[in-house]
């Protein structure tokens, strides 16, 4: 039996929490971070602002950028709510950050129920937190992670098998693989 692995990734997690707290921030470019961008809203990403860049560089790209401090306590509180929901589904989970994780659904759902489960999971997260997440389902963690990035934000993608996955990545740049970034090409 082929494994069913789901990767979930909260969409612009810290920025989305701040927008929930202050709805006037909706549709505005904002980042969470002090010297370094921890999370950028989707509006900020339109200016090529991304995580791990200097806030000063981000402000050069978008002079009207709103910069908010990190509220780790609140982010962890909401992350724990999500974790508790997931642990009601199964304990075969690997939480890799406050905003993402892998869930082994092999013993939880039938293969033909992947799409329905992905939709229901996203809806349940939205009901619980008023936040959106993206989901990828596949046969292993790497392909599930790549799948979760395909239809962001608030989307999902499913690779039914290895053949589908290989076909999808065959014409993509190596950067699609998590962990392969600029530094990789400097080696």
PLM features: residue spans?
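Short acidic/polar capping segments at secondary-structure boundaries
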Residues: 108-109, 138-142, 164, 174, ...
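Structured, non-catalytic alpha/beta "coupling" segments that mediate domain-domain communication
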Residues: 124, 128-145, 149
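Helix-hairpin-helix
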Residues: 9, 135, 170-187
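Residues that scaffold, gate, or flank divalent-cation-dependent active/transport sites
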Residues: 1-98, 102, 109, 121
């Amino acid at each position: 039996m082929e494994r069913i692995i789901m990767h979930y990734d909260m969409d612009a997690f810290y920025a989305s929490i701040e927008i929930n707290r202050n709805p006037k921030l909706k549709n505005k470019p904002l980042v969470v971070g002090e010297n370094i961008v921890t999370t950028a809203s989707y509006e900020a990403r339109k200016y090529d602002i991304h995580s791990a860049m200097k806030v000063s560089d981000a402000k050069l790209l978008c002079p009207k950028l709103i910069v908010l401090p990190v509220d780790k306590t609140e982010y962890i509180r909401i992350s724990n709510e999500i974790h508790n929901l997931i642990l009601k589904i199964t304990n075969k989970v690997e939480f890799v950050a406050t905003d993402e994780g892998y869930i082994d659904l092999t013993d939880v759902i039938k293969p033909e129920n992947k799409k329905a489960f992905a939709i229901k999971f996203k809806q349940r997260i939205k009901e619980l937190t008023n936040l959106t997440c993206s989901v990828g389902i596949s046969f292993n963690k790497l392909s599930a992670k790549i799948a979760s990035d395909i239809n962001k934000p608030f989307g999902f993608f499913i690779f039914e098998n290895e053949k589908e996955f290989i076909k999808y990545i065959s014409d993509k740049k190596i950067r699609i693989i998590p962990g392969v970034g600029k530094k990789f090409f400097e080696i």
